[in-house]
């Protein structure tokens, strides 16, 4: 059974409700995202999470800035959606923060070599996600072709994302990935989680 990360958690009530139900809870710090939180709100969100592992998620923040914010708020993992240099990993390590690099899929991307390269970096996990601007849909509404996900799922600590919902999660779970990562698929509205959908997701992947 895969581990589960619920991303885009933007309020304390959802963070508390999810705590312990899933392994990872993601807080997005990205102005362009409808699920973004403000830096000053991270402390309260972090305090609501006692059992799960919180993750700071960003794309546009300079990596060192993201690591500093995570360290200051006792958030142990930074998931960064831009290309990272070796010194970014070194700096994160010096601050006691783990890094989750991201392999972004766009139509035509050779996904496996990209994932294999990221797996050679010091990583909490490697996330495979679709480009946020992509409108492409594949099996079950997934944003990445299932055949490509099947290629990368067994390579290591690979987390799969991109249009996963309770309805299509069994397709992804059959690939036996290290983790699945879901945001909009378990929402009532952007940044507001629907706990019935969360439970349906967990049931769909054999967790309940």
UniProtKB/Swiss-Prot annotation:
Catalysis performed (reactions): N-(5-phospho-beta-D-ribosyl)anthranilate = 1-(2-carboxyphenylamino)-1-deoxy-D-ribulose 5-phosphate
CDD domains named among the record's database cross-references: PRAI
Pathway membership: Amino-acid biosynthesis; L-tryptophan biosynthesis; L-tryptophan from chorismate: step 3/5
Record bears the keyword Cell membrane: no
InterPro entries in the cross-refs: Aldolase_TIM (IPR013785), PRAI_dom (IPR001240), RibuloseP-bd_barrel (IPR011060), TrpF_fam (IPR044643)
Entry keywords, A to Z: Amino-acid biosynthesis, Aromatic amino acid biosynthesis, Isomerase, Tryptophan biosynthesis
Family annotation (Pfam families): PRAI (PF00697)
Gene3D superfamilies: Aldolase class I
Entry EC no(s): 5.3.1.24
Disulfide bonds: none
Any Gene Ontology biological process: L-tryptophan biosynthetic process
GO terms for MF: phosphoribosylanthranilate isomerase activity
Family the entry assigns: Belongs to the TrpF family.
HAMAP family assigned: PRAI
Protein name: N-(5'-phosphoribosyl)anthranilate isomerase
Organism: Pyrobaculum arsenaticum (strain DSM 13514 / JCM 11321 / PZ6)
